[in-house]
């Protein structure tokens, strides 16, 4: 068979082959082989550490092949991102459905490099701004359209920030942080003034592990219509604070171990604990309403999803379920729970249902290989971030895995946040943070 090579290339290949054989076995006599190939017999090289030409080309081909495979993967990712960015909208209805069902592209639009591992990220509810907290206790504010320099930066705590939350109320942006220094602090932010400390709350006796800020329902007899703050701690307590007055309105112990995370919806508060349980509490009264059992290791994050329902439907029939929540754990699973409806009595706070006081596990989501540290939600989707360096998007209504971002960070993924699918500006943003000191921004 004729080789697809010129005479000169054939001669160089024969010489390189003989040179390689002599380099491999210096005692071999290749004179006869050289004569049969009609090339000059090579001489023994003095530098025995130098690879012959054939070996160098062979390793170069392997490196080029790996590079080609990497470039082909990048092309596929970029093509996928381009299709998502330029997908046409055929009608207002289909465009709105696609926006609500949006899933972030494979590659981030931009990345922010911080001075230490990222511990928390929160999007501004109204502006294209993200707040990032770090292991060194610093709180940064970045414009998503220009991340070259932060809009504001402050040393918020003396130790690592463990949790951050943002809320807009009466034309003011409030940023709340919890820290390992046992402090809870509230800052105000504006484009002109930056971050300004409004108030510090001292009352916990151990690490503050989670914070949430919201406006209390006017129907409650405690903090109704006021700006409230909830914090949980390793001291096993949950505290409700009035941001304006600085008073602690309520303190209760939903668990007997470290309360690692919490979320608030109206007058209901849900917590996850070191003992692997979850608990739903009516925070104005402190009444424990129901408990979630099913995780094998500590619960790392918890979040209400969807909307909570009234006890009686519009048709007058009793509704057995209050709503849904999602929890993530060190057992490498996430669970979608149905929350049982508490018993409501006239002129009295809710109490546990007499026959049904346990969460019902609707779905168990498996796909991560390590601890699942954080969870975010957007419409019918929940996003779980794990120590296996990946993020997975799930449809929480049916438990289906929709997309997985492998090696989204070079280390553990510690936090995630997404914009609200009902945002009036119809934006599509996802941000993640990791111990690689990076904050990745996915947007369209």
From Swiss-Prot:
<keyword id="KW-0498">Mitosis</keyword>
<protein>
    <recommendedName>
        <fullName>Nuclear distribution protein PAC1</fullName>
    </recommendedName>
</protein>
<feature type="repeat" description="WD 4">
    <location>
        <begin position="254"/>
        <end position="293"/>
    </location>
</feature>
<comment type="function">
    <text>Positively regulates the activity of the minus-end directed microtubule motor protein dynein. Plays a central role in positioning the mitotic spindle at the bud neck during cell division. Targets cytoplasmic dynein to microtubule plus ends, thereby promoting dynein-mediated microtubule sliding along the bud cortex and consequently the movement of the mitotic spindle to the bud neck.</text>
</comment>
<feature type="repeat" description="WD 5">
    <location>
        <begin position="307"/>
        <end position="347"/>
    </location>
</feature>
<feature type="repeat" description="WD 1">
    <location>
        <begin position="113"/>
        <end position="152"/>
    </location>
</feature>
<dbReference type="GO" id="GO:0005875">
    <property type="term" value="C:microtubule associated complex"/>
</dbReference>
<keyword id="KW-0206">Cytoskeleton</keyword>
<dbReference type="GO" id="GO:0000922">
    <property type="term" value="C:spindle pole"/>
</dbReference>
<dbReference type="GO" id="GO:0000132">
    <property type="term" value="P:establishment of mitotic spindle orientation"/>
</dbReference>
<keyword id="KW-0853">WD repeat</keyword>
<feature type="repeat" description="WD 6">
    <location>
        <begin position="367"/>
        <end position="406"/>
    </location>
</feature>
<keyword id="KW-0132">Cell division</keyword>
<dbReference type="GO" id="GO:0070840">
    <property type="term" value="F:dynein complex binding"/>
</dbReference>
<dbReference type="GO" id="GO:0005874">
    <property type="term" value="C:microtubule"/>
</dbReference>
<keyword id="KW-0131">Cell cycle</keyword>
<feature type="repeat" description="WD 3">
    <location>
        <begin position="204"/>
        <end position="251"/>
    </location>
</feature>
<dbReference type="GO" id="GO:0051012">
    <property type="term" value="P:microtubule sliding"/>
</dbReference>
<keyword id="KW-0677">Repeat</keyword>
<dbReference type="InterPro" id="IPR037190">
    <property type="entry name" value="LIS1_N"/>
</dbReference>
<feature type="coiled-coil region">
    <location>
        <begin position="59"/>
        <end position="87"/>
    </location>
</feature>
<dbReference type="GO" id="GO:0005737">
    <property type="term" value="C:cytoplasm"/>
</dbReference>
<keyword id="KW-0963">Cytoplasm</keyword>
<comment type="subunit">
    <text>Self-associates. Interacts with NDL1 and dynein.</text>
</comment>
<feature type="repeat" description="WD 2">
    <location>
        <begin position="156"/>
        <end position="199"/>
    </location>
</feature>
<dbReference type="GO" id="GO:0051301">
    <property type="term" value="P:cell division"/>
</dbReference>
<keyword id="KW-0175">Coiled coil</keyword>
<dbReference type="InterPro" id="IPR001680">
    <property type="entry name" value="WD40_rpt"/>
</dbReference>
<dbReference type="Pfam" id="PF00400">
    <property type="entry name" value="WD40"/>
</dbReference>
<feature type="repeat" description="WD 7">
    <location>
        <begin position="408"/>
        <end position="444"/>
    </location>
</feature>
<dbReference type="InterPro" id="IPR053299">
    <property type="entry name" value="ASTRA_WD_repeat"/>
</dbReference>
<dbReference type="InterPro" id="IPR017252">
    <property type="entry name" value="Dynein_regulator_LIS1"/>
</dbReference>
<dbReference type="InterPro" id="IPR036322">
    <property type="entry name" value="WD40_repeat_dom_sf"/>
</dbReference>
<keyword id="KW-0493">Microtubule</keyword>
<comment type="similarity">
    <text>Belongs to the WD repeat LIS1/nudF family.</text>
</comment>
<dbReference type="InterPro" id="IPR015943">
    <property type="entry name" value="WD40/YVTN_repeat-like_dom_sf"/>
</dbReference>
<keyword id="KW-0813">Transport</keyword>
């Amino acid at each position: 068979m004729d080789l697809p090579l010129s005479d000169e290339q054939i001669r160089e290949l024969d010489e390189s082959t003989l040179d390689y054989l002599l380099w491999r076995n210096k005692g071999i006599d290749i004179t006869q082989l050289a004569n049969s190939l009609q090339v000059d017999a090579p001489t023994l090289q003095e530098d025995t550490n130098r690879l012959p030409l054939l070996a160098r080309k062979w390793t170069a081909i392997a490196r080029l092949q790996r590079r080609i495979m990497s470039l082909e993967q990048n092309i596929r990712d970029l093509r996928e991102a381009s299709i998502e960015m330029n997908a046409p909208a055929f009608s207002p209805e289909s465009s709105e459905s696609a926006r609500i069902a949006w899933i972030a592209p494979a590659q981030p639009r931009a990345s922010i490099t911080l001075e230490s591992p990222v511990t928390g990220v929160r999007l501004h509810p109204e502006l294209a701004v993200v707040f990032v907290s770090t292991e060194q206790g610093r709180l940064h504010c970045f414009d998503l359209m220009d991340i070259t320099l932060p809009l504001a930066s402050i040393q918020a705590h003396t130790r690592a920030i463990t949790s951050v939350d943002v809320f807009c109320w009466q034309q003011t942006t409030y940023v709340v942080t919890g820290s390992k220094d046992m402090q809870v602090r509230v800052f105000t932010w504006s484009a002109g003034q930056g971050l300004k400390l409004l108030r510090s709350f001292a009352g916990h006796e151990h690490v503050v592990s989670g914070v949430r800020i919201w406006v209390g329902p006017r129907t409650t007899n405690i903090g109704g219509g006021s700006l409230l703050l909830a914090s949980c701690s390793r001291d096993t307590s949950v505290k409700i604070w009035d941001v304006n007055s600085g008073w602690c309105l309520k303190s209760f112990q939903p668990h007997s171990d470290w309360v690692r995370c919490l979320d608030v919806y109206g007058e209901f508060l849900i917590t996850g604990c070191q003992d692997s349980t979850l608990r739903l509490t009516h925070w104005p009264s402190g009444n424990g309403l129901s408990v979630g059992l099913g995780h094998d290791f500590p619960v790392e994050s918890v979040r209400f999803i969807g909307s909570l329902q009234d006890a009686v439907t519009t048709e007058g029939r009793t509704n057995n379920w209050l709503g849904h929540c999602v929890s993530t754990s060190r057992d490498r699973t996430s669970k979608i729970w149905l929350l049982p409806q508490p018993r409501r009595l006239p002129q009295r706070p809710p109490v546990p249902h007499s026959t049904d006081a346990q969460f019902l596990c609707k779905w168990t989501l498996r796909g991560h290989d390590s601890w699942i540290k954080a969870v975010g939600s957007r419409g019918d989707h929940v996003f779980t971030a794990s120590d296996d360096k990946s993020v997975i998007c799930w449809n929480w209504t049916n438990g289906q895995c929709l997309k997985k971002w492998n090696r989204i960070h070079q280390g553990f993924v510690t936090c995630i946040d997404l914009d609200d699918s009902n945002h009036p500006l119809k934006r599509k943003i996802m941000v993640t943070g990791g111990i690689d000191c990076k904050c990745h921004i996915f947007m369209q």
